[in-house]
């Protein structure tokens, strides 16, 4: 899409999680970009699923039930059970956060967007962000003024680009 539309990207952002970094590296390879600055930020990380981290969906449903898993995945302000100190992924998480709701995710994504990304958009720069479903939901909620009731219903397909064009005063075109 970037090549098709002949878009020159001015700044690249991603989370600190391996899958988003890998996605960005694939994009950079396709774009024949090898010497660019990549802004990696924990604030763009996927929502922290606490004790559910590392479990696949089927195993999680077997353990907690489909209804409860759906509540954790799609509610706005309900957190999954917190990550235990003995959890195998606990050492990989650099913050003291033990579990997050989408509401919590918004509280870290939006300030980062306001401070680091929005000024570049205001300066008419083209930005590419490789990140995750819930951090993307948080940003879309802000940009498009989407209600919390509607944002939890958004399905964001993995690996599909989303092009947002801004006009004057950062209005979405």
Predicted regions and their residues:
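Surface-exposed cleft-lining segments at the edges of enzyme active sites
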Residues: 79, 90-106
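Active-site-adjacent alpha-helix immediately C-terminal to a catalytic or transition-state-stabilizing loop
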Residues: 21-22, 35, 103, 107-172
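Generic detection of long, well-ordered alpha-helical segments
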Residues: 14-17, 62, 99, 106-107, ...
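Phosphate-coordination/substrate-recognition cap region in phosphate-metabolizing enzymes
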Residues: 2-85, 89, 141-165
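A generic short-segment signal for beta-strand/edge and adjacent turn/coil regions
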Residues: 9, 28-29, 96-98, 129-135
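Short helix/loop segment immediately N-terminal to the Walker
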Residues: 84-86, 90, 120, 124-125
């Amino acid at each position: 899409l970037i090549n098709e539309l002949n878009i020159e990207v001015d700044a690249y952002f991603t989370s600190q999680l391996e899958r988003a970094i890998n996605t960005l590296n694939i994009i950079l390879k396709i774009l024949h970009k090898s010497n660019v600055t990549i802004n990696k930020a924990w604030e763009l990380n996927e929502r922290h699923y606490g004790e559910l981290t590392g479990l696949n969906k089927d195993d999680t449903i077997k353990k907690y039930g489909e209804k409860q898993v759906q509540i954790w995945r799609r509610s706005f302000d309900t957190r999954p059970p917190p990550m235990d100190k003995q959890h195998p992924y606990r050492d990989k998480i650099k913050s003291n956060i033990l579990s997050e709701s989408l509401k919590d995710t918004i509280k870290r994504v939006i300030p980062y967007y306001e401070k680091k990304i929005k000024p570049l958009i205001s300066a008419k720069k083209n930005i590419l962000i490789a990140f995750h479903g819930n951090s993307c939901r948080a940003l879309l909620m802000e940009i498009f003024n989407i209600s919390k009731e509607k944002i939890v219903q958004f399905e964001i397909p993995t690996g599909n680009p989303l092009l947002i064009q801004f006009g004057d005063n950062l209005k979405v075109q």
